[in-house]
Every structure is written in C-alpha cells, then in structure tokens.
C-alpha cells in the first residue's frame, strides 16, 4: 500500500517521475520478496516496491555498518506519509488487521466516536477466534484464523455452509507477522520457555495504547489523501 501511494500520490505531489523513485520496504515476511515481482503490483506502471528486505537482514546491515542508534539525534518522521496510528502498529499481530478495521467500521456505521477502541475478543494467538458485535442495530460476525492450517479449517466450514461471516482475517504465519520468516531468530533455550509470539504481540499492543491517534481514519496523512 505504501509503495503504491509513493509511486502515485507522492510522485504527483512532489513532481517526480515514478521511475526515478526507489521504494525499499523492511518486512518481517520473506514472501514479500516474491510479491514485489507480481505483475499486479504496479499502480503507476512501475513496481510499487523495488526492494524488500527482512527485519533480520536490516539488523545485519546495521551491525555491519556499526551504526549506533543511541548516538543519533532525535528527528521527526518524514512528511508527507510519516505519521502513523496505533491501528497500524497492531497489524503485525494476529487479529490486529481485524481490530484496526473494526475501529474504523464501527465509527463509520454508527457515526459516533468509540468509547473503547480495544476489541480484545479478536486478540491472541489461538488458532481460530470468532466474535459478534452489534453495530448500528446489525450483528456483525467476524473471524480470525492464525496460520494456514487454521485458515483451511475455517474456510472449509464457510464453503460447506456451516457458518458465515461479514469479515475474515487470515494470517499465514501463526501469531501473525511478528512470527514471520524474516524476523530475528530466537534460540531454542528461549523458545522452550517463552511464548515469543505472544511477547512480541504484547509489545505492539502496548505501543498502540500509547499512541495519541489509534484509528486508521484519523491519521492526518490519510485524511489529506
């Protein structure tokens, strides 16, 4: 999404030729290396993202150059497109995309500000989670599948007519992007005694709670679009 906006909206705003913009994405997912080469990922007639590196590869580059973040001066993120919300932060955890969407959907449908933005029913690393929310007099049924095995189980039930939902979130990696193939590897000594997926997800939710803006549609950069 960022790559597409960079090559279209940002290029137009800055008077740049999309061909002269190089977009590098740092991702927890190794599949992104394949996705950037897909023919449908070219909103401006050129690849939306030119280079995809994993978080583990970025860490190696940082160590290789000897970069010390503690010695760098504080700076604001670039503008435009430098602002983010709590909803964006939680995308990396299973259920995060669902929760971010619900925050916006509920306010859009009801026309009222949410008294509580946390949808905790869809959080957690369980294989399949279901929840029903009454929104503007309508029962909205949602489901979240963590990992492809659970996704198949959920979709088989839907295809068989056993259940139905208004919105389904599927995370290919169990626990979500925090458990992606490109993430820093954890030793067996740690994995055997610590739920790394849950620990990483907790950091995201903690960061979300500290954000001044926690809903996607309230991001000033998005509103300008």
What is each residue range found by the language model?
Residues 1-225:
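Iron-sulfur-associated redox domains of electron-transfer enzymes in respiratory
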């Amino acid at each position: 999404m960022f790559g597409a906006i960079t090559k279209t909206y940002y290029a137009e705003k800055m008077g740049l030729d999309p061909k002269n913009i190089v977009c590098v994405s740092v991702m927890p997912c190794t599949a992104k290396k394949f996705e950037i080469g897909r023919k449908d990922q070219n909103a401006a007639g050129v690849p939306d993202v030119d280079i995809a590196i994993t978080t583990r590869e970025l860490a190696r580059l940082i160590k290789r150059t000897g970069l010390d973040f503690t010695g760098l001066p504080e700076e604001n993120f670039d503008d435009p497109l430098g602002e983010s919300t709590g909803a964006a932060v939680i995308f990396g955890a299973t259920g995060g995309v669902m929760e971010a969407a619900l925050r916006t959907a509920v306010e859009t449908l009801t026309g009222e500000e949410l008294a509580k933005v946390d949808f905790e029913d869809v959080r957690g690393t369980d294989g399949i989670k279901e929840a029903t929310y009454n929104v503007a007099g309508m029962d909205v049924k949602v489901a979240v599948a963590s990992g492809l095995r659970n996704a198949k189980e959920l979709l088989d039930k839907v295809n068989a007519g056993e259940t139905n939902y208004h919105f389904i979130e599927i995370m290919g990696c169990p626990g979500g992007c925090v458990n992606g193939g490109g993430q820093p590897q954890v030793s067996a000594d740690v994995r055997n005694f610590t739920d790394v997926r849950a620990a990483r997800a907790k950091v995201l939710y903690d960061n979300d709670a500290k954000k001044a803006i926690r809903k996607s549609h309230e991001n000033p950069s998005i509103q300008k679009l």
